Amino acid sequence: MLVAVLSIFVGAALAPLLVRLLGRAAGWVLGLLPLGVFVYFAQTLPQIAHGESLRQTYEWLPSLETPLSFYLDGLSLLFALLVTGIGALIVVYAGGYLAHHHQLGRFYVQLLSFMGAMLGLVVADNVFVFFIFFELTSLTSYLLIGFYHTEEGSRRAARKALIVTGGGGLALLGGLVLLGGVAGTWEFSRMLDLGASVQGHPYYLAIFILVCAGAFTKSAQFPFHFWLPAAMAGPTPVSAYLHSATMVKAGVFLLARLHPVLGGTALWTGTLGLFGGFTMLMSAWLALRYTGLKQILAYTTVMVLGLLTMLLGIGTEAAITAMVTFTVVHALYKGGLFMMAGNIDHGTGTRDLLELGGLWAAMPWTMAGGVATGLSMAGIPPLFGFIGKEVTYEAALHMHTWGLLVLVASVLANVALVGAGLLVGLTPFIGEVKGAFTRDPHEATPSMWVGPLILGIGGLAFGLYPSSIDHTLLQAAQAGILQESHEVHLALWHGITPAFIASLVTFALGGVVYAFWQGLRVSAFMEGVGAVFGWGPGEVFERGLYGGVHLSGAITRRVQNGQFRWYLCATFLSLLVLVGGGMLAGGGGAEFSFSGEIRYYEVALATLILLSIAAAVRTHDRFVAILALSVGGYGVALVYLLFGAPDLAMTQFAVETLTLILLVIVIVHLPGIQGDEPIGVRLRDGLVAAGCGALLTTIMSVVIQTSLDLRVSDYLAQKSYTEAEGHNIVNVILVDFRGLDTMGEITVLAIAAIGVYVLMRMPRQKKPSLAAGTSVAASRSDAAETETD
């Protein structure tokens, strides 16, 4: 499995070279890589379907108990096949969609890196390896969503996705650390049997909240749903991949993986059922407010994510069967529909349903894939979407409590989904051409229509022959979640059942929604749905982000006020409060005792240092203050010399001399000291200085009285002369044991010196006149208008 994951990243590294050599044909070649990985995982299906699991471990960070471990069971196999199978189609599709884009190579690097991260996520066993891949998906999706980085909308959408999912990732890290500590293991495969002990632990509530925060943000559950529709600013291949089978299902996968550990409690069922059900119902109807194909598909994606979360919350055998079934259903039709939307935009110049119609003759292959996937989204038999909808209703009907409420909510959500599926699958192709397109309608290249066609055929094949997948892949995935195997039997026809009657009601009401969509989308009802679900959380996020920027600016202006004395005072005061307060709270301290002899020249030297400091503080002449500070510095150097540190004393003498020379050179450019500071300021500075001095003295006393582990010191003392051939241990440490660190510090200083030199050599510019300023402002205004246009 490690080779499978790494091969995707190797393909990402080679992608720019292949694009340069093969051009648009590179997509077909690169698509062979995820296809090969798909075949690798597919050949494990017979073994996994018989209840076995595969585990591979590689030593990575043994000192931190973090092996590079992978775990393949039915659940991870299902997602691995979706990631690689649909990923292969998307790679081919992107080659046609972005054929003329000058940064196609960069796009493939980002796309394949995301694919590798997502594949690593679903097969990872160690929680820290899982988290690394989890965060890598957020980072690479940020790059993909913001691929059109010259457009403000793309940058804003990418930033929104990164902040929301990144914030959830931080919460998830805390939850995983707590979970591993409570379970006593960092491997998911070993946690699966520890559900009772974890759920009975006092930390269960904290673990549950933190894990849900990570999963809800990743899978766009209310109130974190708003980033996903905004992410439609990215290229269509990104939407087709990230929002059908991969990134947005990462949170659902996490909840499914931890279902045996955290699931089954009232908290789990209530939280996932409530948030998932509300997300499902509201987003399904909110999709009907829009006329753009990608916007409709985005909100119906949120709807399905809510449905999957709700089914995981229910947690029964029927609900988990419905969850794994609908995961496949959604991946098949949503990936195809997004690619269809891209083909229509590519061929006509628009994705607006109000402008589309009559494309059946101009785009026959796109129509075939679009109609098949659209009808599957609507749940029309004999497509796989019909079976997915029926097993969802069966899950509600098998509930002992709240079953009727869940059934009604599911029917209402699917009514909107039927209308949306008919809108995106039929409306662009039937009827007459509604207006003049910006481009002459034409069929896309084979690389662009083969993906929707294959996914549409897949939905039809699984609908007609569900036995090809139910007893193998779906049953294994269900067992991976429930940790026990139950028979999964899917069929296109079960007779006249309550679920079938609910489907008939859904079709009838969905047809009404489709017929009267134009009036419905502007109705007061839809305005209310939009006010609650569409604008609220997103508006709160934008206002919070805007307010946070302004608040941080105000704080920065207050703290970073340009007064160096204030910076020093704040730094030392923080040190005094944090370190000193911590020592007092912990009962730390030092016993001061002295039994040695005090010599007269030591008293004289200490007196000299104190008098020089007093002179520096009290004088009104900068030159006198500099000389006084230098006298104090030379006095400290003499202290080093008297107490057996001649090299340190020599360094101190050199530093004091250079500092004195530099300060004397620049002092002529400084203003004089203007009178005395207010008594309050002087008292504050004096207290801070005295407090820091007392704190450092206390720390040194504690260090002296503490028994230290001398193994490192002894090692350095022994090796400095025999191997490094140096008599001075400090010098040997600087230039030998930590020579790379020293070289880095020297490099930093050299770069800083170069920067200062460049600044000093820059010619002074005259202050621009009013006319020049007006001209610059006008040119900036023109540029802004051009960018807006």
Per-region residue spans from a language model:
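Flexible extramembrane loops and terminal tails that flank transmembrane helices
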Residues: L584, F594-L605, A614-V617, H669-D789
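Alpha-helical transmembrane segments and their helix-start/interface "positive-inside/aromatic belt" motifs
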Residues: G23-P34, A157-G166, A361-G370, H442-I457, ...
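Short aromatic-rich membrane-water interface segments that cap or initiate transmembrane helices
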Residues: W60-L78, L194-F208, L397-L407, V488-G495, ...
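Membrane-interface and transmembrane segments of multi-pass membrane proteins
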Residues: R439-L578, C692-G693, L708-S720, K766-D789
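Transmembrane helix-loop-helix hairpins at membrane boundaries of multipass inner-membrane proteins
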Residues: L2, A13-V109, L178-G200, F226, ...
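Hydrophobic transmembrane alpha-helices and their helix-loop junctions in integral membrane proteins
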Residues: L89-R106, L111-F130, L139-A444, G581, ...
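Hydrophobic alpha-helical membrane-insertion segments
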Residues: G31-L45, G168-V177, V371-A378, G451-S468, ...
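Membrane-interfacial helical/loop segments at transmembrane boundaries in membrane proteins
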Residues: L54-L64, E187-A196, K389-A395, S468-W493, ...
